[in-house]
């Protein structure tokens, strides 16, 4: 299961959600546009990462959209 921390104005957040949806992979989205507490919590889990999207898989931090896309190209997103 993926967890994506997003903002409503981020194009890479949209692309990450579209990629996971196109692969029929489930994800939970947490909009941190105005939720600074959730953003700070995610940033701590991600080792200080401050930009969105912040993408996690089974509580492990993946990175941003580029990192997610690299995993897709390597065939590592589908179980």
List where the protein language model places each region:
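Short alpha-helical
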Residues: 11, 37, 50, 63
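Non-catalytic interaction surface on structured domains
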Residues: 23-26, 44-45, 61, 70-71
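C-terminal alpha-helical interaction module
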Residues: 4-6, 43, 74
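Local sequence-structure signature of Cys/Sec-based thiol-disulfide redox active-site neighborhoods
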Residues: 1-28
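Non-catalytic, surface beta->alpha helical segment in thiol-disulfide oxidoreductase systems
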Residues: 57-79
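Structural micro-motif
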Residues: 46-56, 65-66
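Thioredoxin-like thiol-disulfide oxidoreductase module
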Residues: 32-48, 76
């Amino acid at each position: 299961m993926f967890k994506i921390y997003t903002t409503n104005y981020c194009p890479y957040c949209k692309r990450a959600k579209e990629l996971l949806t196109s692969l029929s992979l489930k994800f939970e989205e947490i909009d941190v546009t105005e939720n600074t507490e959730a953003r700070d919590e995610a940033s701590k889990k991600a080792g200080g990462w401050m930009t969105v999207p912040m993408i996690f898989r089974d509580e492990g931090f993946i990175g941003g959209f580029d990192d997610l896309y690299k995993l897709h190209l390597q065939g590592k997103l589908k179980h």
